Amino acid sequence: MFVLNKFHNILHYKKIVPVVLLSCVSLIGCSNSNAQSEPPKQTNQANQIKQENTGNQSFAKLEKEYDAKLGIYALDTGTNQTIAYHSDDRFAFASTSKSLAAGALLRKNSLEALDQRITYTHEDLSNYNPITEKHVDTGMTLKELADASVRYSDSTAHNLILKQLGGPSEFEKILREMGDTVTTSERFEPELNEVHPGETHDTSTPEAIAKTLQSFTLGTALPIEKRELLVDWMKRNTTGDNLIRAGVPKGWEVADKTGAGSYGTRNDIAIIWPPNKKPIVLAILSNHDKEDAKYDDKLIADATKVVLNTLKATE
């Protein structure tokens, strides 16, 4: 649902009304013919509820069209409006967690420490290694591993980052310290992508993961130099062109991290910068009923369009 801070105007109205009535009674010229006021205009709150219902109907329509389940949470940081659809339901986070793990790495280490070189072997390579497989002989710095993990979704890079943090449980501990009591991390790649219905390991909710991403990129979880580094990696992500990026108008900036897993899981979490406006935090998670289901990136792009159109309608 949306959150709009309009109560100041309501309170101000309540203070003024008695004064107006008193003035009317005390004046002889206040006649019954002028007593009837114009019908009240639709309030912003009513318009908000109307747009929320419209958005929910549109999301449900997309779910039916793509035979999928959607989970959405969006926050316009300029207006504090929110959109929530299945926002408290758990979904496998898949590779979206790579952006959070990179944030945790930045939180735990100095920028100088990121120059530490990590060595690994062919046995350490995971299921998807577009960058790390090229550097087995030389190893990679922590900074290079974070770049590979976030921008190319390199699974070995993610695993090496998790090991540097102390394992999935220590990664989760860092999230707890930040106030995220929902997101769970138990396994490495590629196992973390296999989550069956009802399981909670390696999952989050749209609202929880969006707020944690916001803390890392826009909040106080990291000092500004580290925030800028994480945002830069996400802005230069190479895997998201067909997802949230495909659903925003031309000229808008997007920093995102995608993910995919079993049961047709397809996710994207992002910070979106409209021109001359404050950023929008957006998490779109999705899955299907069948374990071997195929995902369609267009679902995420279409859901993004609904989110942005709904936010625009309630401005």
Language model: regions and residue ranges:
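Sec-dependent N-terminal signal peptides of Gram-positive bacterial secreted proteins and lipoproteins
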Residues: 2-5, 11-34
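Structured C-terminal helix/loop/strand segments within mature extracytoplasmic catalytic/sensor domains
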Residues: 30-60, 64, 82, 163-164, ...
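Extracytoplasmic
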Residues: 65-69, 86-88, 96, 113-115, ...
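Short, conserved catalytic-motif segment at the N-terminal edge
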Residues: 68-90
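Active-site SXXK
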Residues: 80, 92-120, 282
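Short, glycine/proline-biased beta-turn/loop segments that scaffold the active-site neighborhood
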Residues: 111-135
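Conserved catalytic neighborhood of penicillin-recognizing serine enzymes
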Residues: 126-161, 168
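Mid-domain, small-residue-enriched loop/turn segments at the edges of structured enzyme/sensor domains
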Residues: 160-218
